[in-house]
């Protein structure tokens, strides 16, 4: 019994000593994080979709803060995120990356053809924002409020029952198409 007590005390003291050494080393040799990278990363939507050309939001934030990468490449964040990053970095806002259609992007949503869904859960595993709900061997569905339209759930589906479609127009996302309004110059008479 005496040997067990000695062993427990010795191991406790060793664990305490090594814990203190590790604690000291972690503070002494800590690498300082760039606060600008953290701030840019907080502004990004954290969908980890890769549409910007980087494997996730953190690498894109590092490229923007340290390497001067363009601030307009986050498709899910769109113009609001680009404006916030421009304000944070004190740079001029840029037009969104891509063609003219990207300036007013159409919100895309994943839609599951539910009768053809086999419930394999591969789309659930691929979704970075947990917008797909369902269970193994049960029908899955997409929560449209959470879906960012990142397209990461489409390829893993073995039955190709997922596709991206434009979001339905509602009063929340409707915008007036100014190109449909006829513009006429109205002559104004000048009175003396």
Swiss-Prot record:
Alphabetic keyword roster: 4Fe-4S, Cell inner membrane, Cell membrane, Electron transport, Iron, Iron-sulfur, Membrane, Metal-binding, Repeat, Translocase, Transport
Broad EC category: translocase
Main localization, broad class: membrane
Cofactor(s) required for function per UniProt: [4Fe-4S] cluster
Region annotation (Hydrophobic) ranges: 1-26
Entries under InterPro entries matching the protein: 4Fe-4S_dom, 4Fe4S_Fe-S-bd, 4Fe4S_Fe_S_CS, 4Fe4S_Ferredoxin_RnfB, Elect_transpt_cplx_RnfB/RsxB, RnfB/RsxB_Proteobac
Pfam family, one: Fer4_21
EC number: 7.-.-.-
Keyword rRNA-binding: no
Binding site for [4Fe-4S] cluster 2: 117, 120, 123, 157
UniProt GO molecular function: 4 iron, 4 sulfur cluster binding; electron transfer activity; metal ion binding
Residues involved in [4Fe-4S] cluster 3 binding: 127, 147, 150, 153
Places the protein is found: Cell inner membrane
UniProt-annotated binding residues for [4Fe-4S] cluster 1: 49, 52, 57, 74
Note describing how the cofactor binds: Binds 3 [4Fe-4S] clusters.
Gene Ontology biological process terms from the UniProt entry: electron transport chain
Family, similarity comment: Belongs to the 4Fe4S bacterial-type ferredoxin family. RnfB subfamily.
Annotated HAMAP family: RsxB_RnfB
Function: Part of a membrane-bound complex that couples electron transfer with translocation of ions across the membrane.
Protein name from the UniProt record: Ion-translocating oxidoreductase complex subunit B
């Amino acid at each position: 019994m005496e040997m067990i007590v000695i062993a427990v005390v010795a191991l406790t003291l060793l664990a305490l000593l090594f814990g203190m050494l590790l604690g000291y080393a972690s503070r002494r040799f800590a690498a300082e994080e760039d606060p600008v990278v953290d701030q840019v990363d907080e502004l990004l939507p954290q969908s980890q979709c890769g549409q910007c050309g980087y494997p996730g939001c953190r690498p894109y934030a590092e490229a923007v803060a340290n390497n001067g990468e363009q601030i307009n490449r986050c498709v899910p964040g769109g113009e609001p995120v680009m404006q916030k990053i421009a304000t944070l970095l004190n740079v001029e806002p840029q037009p969104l990356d891509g063609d003219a259609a990207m300036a007013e992007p159409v919100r895309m949503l994943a839609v599951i053809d539910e009768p053809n869904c086999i419930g394999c859960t591969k789309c659930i595993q691929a979704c970075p924002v947990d917008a797909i709900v369902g269970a193994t061997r049960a029908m899955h569905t997409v929560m449209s409020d959470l879906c960012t339209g990142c397209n990461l759930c489409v390829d893993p589906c073995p039955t190709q029952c997922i596709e991206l479609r434009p979001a339905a127009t509602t009063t929340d996302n409707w915008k007036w198409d100014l190109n449909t309004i006829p513009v006429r110059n109205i002559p104004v008479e000048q009175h003396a």
